[in-house]
Amino acid sequence: MFLMPTSSELNSGQNFLTQWMTNPSRAGVILNRGFPILEADKEKRAAVDISTSFPIKGTHFSDSFSFINEEDSLLEEQKLESNNPYKPQSDKSETHTAFPCIKKGPQVAACHSAPGHQEENKNDFIPDLASEFKEGAYKDPLFKKLEQLKEVQQKKQEQLKRQQLEQLQRLMEEQEKLLTMVSGQCTLPGLSLLPDDQSQKHRSPGNTTTGERATCCFPSYVYPDPTQEETYPSNILSHEQSNFCRTAHGDFVLTSKRASPNLFSEAQYQEAPVEKNNLKEENRNHPTGESILCWEKVTEQIQEANDKNLQKHDDSSEVANIEERPIKAAIGERKQTFEDYLEEQIQLEEQELKQKQLKEAEGPLPIKAKPKQPFLKRGEGLARFTNAKSKFQKGKESKLVTNQSTSEDQPLFKMDRQQLQRKTALKNKELCADNPILKKDSKARTKSGSVTLSQKPKMLKCSNRKSLSPSGLKIQTGKKCDGQFRDQIKFENKVTSNNKENVTECPKPCDTGCTGWNKTQGKDRLPLSTGPASRLAAKSPIRETMKESESSLDVSLQKKLETWEREKEKENLELDEFLFLEQAADEISFSSNSSFVLKILERDQQICKGHRMSSTPVKAVPQKTNPADPISHCNRSEDLDHTAREKESECEVAPKQLHSLSSADELREQPCKIRKAVQKSTSENQTEWNARDDEGVPNSDSSTDSEEQLDVTIKPSTEDRERGISSREDSPQVCDDKGPFKDTRTQEDKRRDVDLDLSDKDYSSDESIMESIKHKVSEPSRSSSLSLSKMDFDDERTWTDLEENLCNHDVVLGNESTYGTPQTCYPNNEIGILDKTIKRKIAPVKRGEDLSKSRRSRSPPTSELMMKFFPSLKPKPKSDSHLGNELKLNISQDQPPGDNARSQVLREKIIELETEIEKFKAENASLAKLRIERESALEKLRKEIADFEQQKAKELARIEEFKKEEMRKLQKERKVFEKYTTAARTFPDKKEREEIQTLKQQIADLREDLKRKETKWSSTHSRLRSQIQMLVRENTDLREEIKVMERFRLDAWKRAEAIESSLEVEKKDKLANTSVRFQNSQISSGTQVEKYKKNYLPMQGNPPRRSKSAPPRDLGNLDKGQAASPREPLEPLNFPDPEYKEEEEDQDIQGEISHPDGKVEKVYKNGCRVILFPNGTRKEVSADGKTITVTFFNGDVKQVMPDQRVIYYYAAAQTTHTTYPEGLEVLHFSSGQIEKHYPDGRKEITFPDQTVKNLFPDGQEESIFPDGTIVRVQRDGNKLIEFNNGQRELHTAQFKRREYPDGTVKTVYANGHQETKYRSGRIRVKDKEGNVLMDTEL
């Protein structure tokens, strides 16, 4: 359950924001754990009056808002509170301030976050019913014991509702009062009593949210301690501004700090850790403890202010309720005027200055003893710039920013860093002069300006400390004070932007920071220093006094400017020469980098001519950074050499602001030129100091201090610049050009730093010389830059304007602004030199060189010789670097002014080296330019080549793609064309259609005829087949009859022969001879017949004999015209049975002869002989000896006929081989195949189907088929076929061709293509698939 806040809680919304938002590292943590609602109830019960609650609440607010990054700071704050007599009250008020008057959302968050803290801090609160309520309220959300505390909560809620209504009413009344008061008075931007809208106007755009929150806080806290503001404006402003800048978003910090001295003391104490850390670092380099003394003085002043505030708060205890306390105008309550306070400050600063001078005389020796930082190794130069710089800036920025809201702090510091990097002359003077205009830009400025303000208070405090401390300590305090100055500067800038009336007062606070200088300067400053106080208490009538003092200051400044102009030329020349000599002595080694010294000399000469292009020697970075406000200028000067430089810068700042205020006309007339010149120098100095800070060279205390301070100072410088820019924009007095010039300068310095080659062995020495010169020059230039800080230089804009205008305006402004009274602080020569350095714009001086030089120059304190020659250098923080340079030069501090001779020698040497360096420089520049041009040309060529290659590849790819596409198109078109042609061919023309029709008709007719013929042929074939069968049967029957009749005939013949034998013996003999012949043939045939009978016809013997005898008869027929008569008698010889034959043989044998080899020869009566061989072979020889028959044992039979024919029968193959006397050989195979081998080698083969094949000796073959087809095979394998229909075919390995009788030729190739040539000349070609490839019609 969330409880609605009361009016006290609404007012405490500011505190809530501070508690909740102040420190980015501790974001979301509420430092004061008191629950505002419960506390409000508690306060009612405790009847705490306004006087007690108000300062307490203020202290609590400051305490809760403490700007500390670490818990130690919180502890320190607690210590401060414990020291604070009003601590119990603060504890009471803590609860109220814990939760600011925020919207419901923030309140809810506060309620959530508060419970835990409330329980933790129960003991801290006064034990009463309110504490019990607190415990219940906080335990409820944490432990969820709502049942136990319901009653208490209900009561509390009712009370809270009542209180809330009352407080809201009171708040509205207070706001109305504040509005009325504000309408009559110009309030500070951070402390604006205006409503949210108006207060936001004075805030930066990023602060709008916090502005709303702040408005709630302002009514209750604004001007709680006017006495404190009056009495210690500079210190309080510094702390308040620093805190305010830290919480730039909230703007509550300033109000809270002002609310009570406790707040202020706590704020100081919060800043103290940072400053103490800086002091510690400074003490490392500077054994003296002046900074500590300064701090003590500041704390004492703060305590006094707190006492005054407490008194006033006691007086203001009229209000019964904390939230109802009236907001009284601080002006009426002031008991001490700002002029009085300035007088006191001036006295303190004079004392500190004296002490510093004494310590400076003592300090250089120990400082001189410190080892010189060795040259940077490769890669360390830029790395040290960037890394160290970023580290220091980050660390210090974080310190400054922690009090600011995280969101605002980050952008502010980012802007600061960027701006610091740029060459910018701070516009603090312009801001002071243009405060009425600044109000317009107050929003933008509050961010950057807030940082600057916080830095300014630090600078003021540091300036006080510096006056007490030696140069080293001054530098240390300068670092610490940088944050204060920044705070002050931010605060003052905001005040100036919000308070047009305080325009004159703005320079006065700047003087307040610088009051430590001279009384004369302090007098000038009095109006300036009163500025911050008057800003804080803008309502006081002191403004009029300030304005009067400002007018007087303007007159004095104008006089100083005139003096400066007169002495400028001479002083510039002398100062430059002296600085060069000092650097030369400090950096004895001269190398190619020593050309920087020559460069500086040239630049000095160019400055006189108005062509100074670089601000390297003029490096018054602190001035640059702080020119926006003299305090900020002091911070930068402190950054340079927080000792003398702080003094000088403070003094310079005051006069500068005075000048800017008093001589607003002059600033208007000369601001552009002067500011340009000063900004050049300041921007250069800033760059040097920034570089030095980044480098963090431990050799010189000033370097280390400046490093730390640079982080701080750089931030304010950017803020101051922003303020200056805004003020310039707002005020016609400020040159618009200057704002951009600032940033541009920083950029140029950066560029120069980058351009410088830190690796050069002598760059460090050159840089140190340059730096020393720059520091010396920058000290005056700082003052001038403070006056000219309004001028900002953009790198884009030419420095020629500065050079032209710097000679005049820079001299005047430099004298006045630098010293307030240039004669007082600086000798005329030095002032001239400073202005000269400002004019000088060392164009290419790189940041690295500036850094290294600044390191070297910073490391040793300014030598006494330098102080003797140029007393103005002593107070300036840059003088520390100069002192370091003098130490390097081994010029003892005690050396009398008689060292001018040595300085002259050094000058001559430097001039000689300068000429040489210039030569190297020119050559190097030309070479670098040529190299750059060559590299650019090569790069361009490479790019062109790469582009050409790429274009070529693309073009080739495109051409190839186009080619492929065209090929695909062609293929498609070809396919389409082929299809078209094929389709066209498939459609015959009219003539062809007629022919086709005619042919079809003829084919139909022929088919019909063929069918009829086939029918007829089939019938004829069947008829003939039946006839053949009948004939075969008849033939068989006839043969059977013949056999029977032959048997009968033989029987009858035998009987007749037996009868006649007895009668005719002689006839017998004749018959015997003939019978022998016939028997021989008959035997051979008979044996064959027997074999046939056994194999084929075992049941019949006659048919085989007949069939056996048939072949000889056929053979006879086949023989050429040979008669078959000899065969005919064989048939009757075959018929007699073997028995009969044996009987007949037995009867016919006349004799038998046995041979020794076992063969037996029988002689028959008819004269034939039979020889039987032992192996079964039988040989028969006819009576005439012409017919010989040999029957072999294997069944083969060989017959030699009377006509010399030889018939050989192969029993196994059943083949008959007949050889004729002329050489013809005829083979009869059992299958019916007949082969004839002619003597000439020709062979004729007749197959059973009556096909005749002729084989010619030359290899040709000819086959004649029964249908009349003739096939001829050539020796080459070609085959020619002639059909009976007149067609011819030719078969080769490549093709087959058919020729038709009508002349058409069709050829089929091996690949399947078909080509047809018609008699008309038409040619048609088809592929293997039958597709028509070509068809020509003639």
UniProtKB/Swiss-Prot annotation:
Modified residues (Phosphoserine): S260, S316, S540, S589, S595, S759
Effect of Y341A: Decreases interaction with alpha/beta-tubulin
Keywords on record: Cytoplasm, Cytoskeleton, Disease variant, Dwarfism, Intellectual disability, Microtubule, Phosphoprotein, Primary microcephaly
Effect upon mutating R378E: Decreases interaction with alpha/beta-tubulin; disrupts association with microtubule distal tip; no effect on association with microtubule lattice
Effect of S595A: Abolishes phosphorylation by PLK2 and procentriole formation
Primary location: cytoplasm
Location(s), subcellular: Cytoplasm, Cytoskeleton, Microtubule organizing center, Centrosome; Cytoplasm, Cytoskeleton, Microtubule organizing center, Centrosome, Centriole
Variant or mutagenesis effect after changing S589A: Abolishes phosphorylation by PLK2 and procentriole formation
Example of a GO biological process term: positive regulation of centriole elongation
Phenotype upon changing F375A: Strongly decreases interaction with alpha/beta-tubulin; causes shorter centrioles and doublet microtubules in cilia
Post-translational modification: Phosphorylation at Ser-589 and Ser-595 by PLK2 is required for procentriole formation and centriole elongation. Phosphorylation by PLK2 oscillates during the cell cycle: it increases at G1/S transition and decreases during the exit from mitosis. Phosphorylation at Ser-595 is also mediated by PLK4 but is not a critical step in PLK4 function in procentriole assembly.
Biased composition (Basic and acidic residues): 541-550, 635-650, 717-764
Effect of E1235V: In MCPH6; reduced interaction with STIL
Disordered: region residues: 190-211, 386-414, 436-479, 521-551, 611-789, 845-865, 1096-1153
Domain of life: Eukaryota
GO CC terms, sorted: centriole; centrosome; ciliary basal body; cytoplasm; cytosol; gamma-tubulin small complex; microtubule; procentriole replication complex
Annotated effect of mutating F375A: Decreases interaction with alpha/beta-tubulin; disrupts association with microtubule distal tip; no effect on association with microtubule lattice
Biased amino acid composition, Acidic residues: 1140-1149
Family: Belongs to the TCP10 family.
Subunit structure: Forms homodimers. Associates with microtubules plus ends; binds to beta-tubulin subunits exposed on microtubule outer surface at its distal tip; also associates with microtubule lattice. Associated with the gamma-tubulin complex. Interacts with the head domain of EPB41. Interacts with LYST. Interacts with CEP152 (via C-terminus). Interacts with STIL. Forms a complex with STIL and SASS6.
PANTHER family: CENTROMERE PROTEIN J, T COMPLEX PROTEIN 10
Protein name: Centrosomal P4.1-associated protein
